Amino acid sequence: MSSKTQLRQQFCELTGTSNTTATKYLESVRYDLARAIDNYYNKHPNKAQVTKKPVKVKIDDRLIQIFDKYKDSEDPNKIDIEGTLTYLGDLGISPDQIESLSLALLLKSPKTGVFTRENFLHIWQYYQCFDIGAMSEFITRFNKDLVNNIGGFKDISTVSDDENKSVPLKFQDLYNFTFKFSLETESQKFLDLDTAIEYWKLLLPIITETYSKDNKLDEEFKNHVNERVEQWFKFLTDTEYMTKKSISYDSWSMFYLFFKEIVLIDPIKFKDYDEMAAWPSVVDEFLEYLHDFELL
């Protein structure tokens, strides 16, 4: 059975349509199964409401071989830190690049340096990436989509549901994922302050750059924003003001909104800041810090 025949068969099984319909949608996207299914449900949203029998997807042997190359010697159902570093190297990705976080989000990594067999195999099977080259090319596109906040890719756990319930992945999803991904244990509730700062140094410039590009803002504006970011880091490491050594998920996720809705709108005066709004205490303390040093 040819690969195109297999893809048509999978399309028919997943959508309950005819071979003719499958061929039409697959040919329009050069036999990219994921895009073909998305396009079908975009044009026929009512079809997504039909309850379909779960389909057991056969995993391509090439994917199994790739996973087995990197799997942990003590636990064959996961890739651990050593295998992950080798995998990233083969993909041409450095661990400190934003692409490594995008890959972790894509493959639903439970924590830093770990990929599970089930997610690795099923997600790459869904996207029809069966070799390192295809995976590398896909990650480049996926990361670009996230960084530019386009939302062109969906959480694959939702794509077979009602189209209105399908969840597009955007940069905020990557940002929030980073917190939980960085925790060392499942029971851990707070992120070490130094770790939080390192990830903010990676993520905040991307938010600034995207906002500046979308709103055609100049270098002077970006310099004002970057100055506020540096003041945020200085505040966090000032033991007189910041007695906590960790960041809660609420503080992490709300700072994203504070940065987009307050800092990026007016980095000089914070004109939209409302001290009566439900910001986490660390944000209120940051504003107090700025006032004390006559920085605001």
From Swiss-Prot:
GO terms for biological process: protein neddylation. InterPro entries: DCN-prot, DCN1-like_PONY, PONY_dom, UBA-like_sf. GO terms for cellular component: ubiquitin ligase complex. Residues 58-291 form the DCUN1 domain. One of its GO terms (molecular function) is ubiquitin conjugating enzyme binding. Keywords: Ubl conjugation pathway. Residues 4-41 form the UBA-like domain. It holds the Pfam family UBA_4. The keyword Iron-sulfur does not apply. Signal peptide: none annotated. PANTHER family: DCN1-LIKE PROTEIN 3, RP42 RELATED. May contribute to neddylation of cullin components of SCF-type E3 ubiquitin ligase complexes. Neddylation of cullins play an essential role in the regulation of SCF-type complexes activity. This is Defective in cullin neddylation protein 1. It comes from Candida albicans (strain SC5314 / ATCC MYA-2876) (Yeast).
